């Protein structure tokens, strides 16, 4: 047994001993049952001694999470508790109120409370008799003050390093074995993270500034080009405006001409209708002439037939005259034979002969006239046939002319309709051209405004580029300090 081991005497002396320490404390026996519960621990944990004495699971009774008390863990393994249980460590005796070969601390609550739980095993005549556990205020302990002062020193050194531009500096502290509150430890961590973040931001800002400078230069060059293009565009728009005005005037002139063409087309359509009507009348008249020619031809043919009948009658008369002449000759011959008795008969025969000769002569003359009439009639028939053919050709030509007139009328009507549509479209185009001219004028004004705005952008871009250059130099100086 080490001489530093606490020797626990009669259990009846333990409460008196704990009350003399003037710190919250309690003791458990070797079985883990509470054998002493001083007034300070009773007030701190709001648990009267009579409610705690004899309890073997005091931690499970008092802790919200049901965890065991440090004294019970040490009672299980007095000389090896820091190896058996997570969250149990050896306390630094230079800051702890208890001393001994084994002074344990509960590290699981070190960062969550201002209380410091410390326990040490107690022996009597070399035999393990129990454990004393005290609750120490960490904020008033020398260790706490030392760790807090060390943390403040780390914070100041780190801030000085940041001020010098060394953003890789960190706050070094053993967070896993300290009495400091988690809030203090988090301050150190936050400062280290701030340094890392600030270094990253400075690098990023430096890179961004370089990119912005390059982009600003590109924007400046592009703005200058845009300025030139805007000026050229403004000039072009002005030219277009002039050309559109000319176009508008031309379209209006075309619209006026189209209106005149519409009137002319209407006149042509009317004349074509009149021509078609006249051709129709001519066709009717030619048809009447053709009918009349056919009638004349028929009459001439009938006359020719009658003349042929007359010719036959003349032939008969000529025959009769010849026979009469023969009879008169025979009568003269007989009268000559008869002598004086036949002289009267001879005279009659001579008269008959003369009459027959006259009849025969007249019949010949008639026959000659009939022949001439037949020739004239034949010529007339031929001429009438030719005339009829020509009339038929003329009728056909007139009918063709009527068909052509009808086609002309249809074409003129279609042309008139198309020209009316063209006139309407041209009038609409004239109105549209006027609107376009107005819009182009507005565009020209906008182009002038854009040119002015681009010039302002160029000026602002140059100023921004200068500001970015100054910012880059400032960031570089901050990084190089």
From Swiss-Prot:
Its main location: cytoplasm. It is found in: Cytoplasm. GO terms for molecular function: transmembrane signaling receptor activity. One of its GO terms (biological process) is chemotaxis. It comes from the Archaea. Signal peptide: none annotated. Keywords: Chemotaxis, Cytoplasm, Transducer. SMART domains: MA (SM00283). The keyword Amino-acid biosynthesis does not apply. Coiled coil: none annotated. Residues 10-81 form the PAS domain. PROSITE patterns: CHEMOTAXIS_TRANSDUC_2, PAS. One of its GO terms (cellular component) is membrane. Residues 208-444 form the Methyl-accepting transducer domain. Potentially involved in chemo- or phototactic signal transduction. Belongs to the methyl-accepting chemotaxis (MCP) protein family. This is Halobacterial transducer protein 9. The gene is htr9.
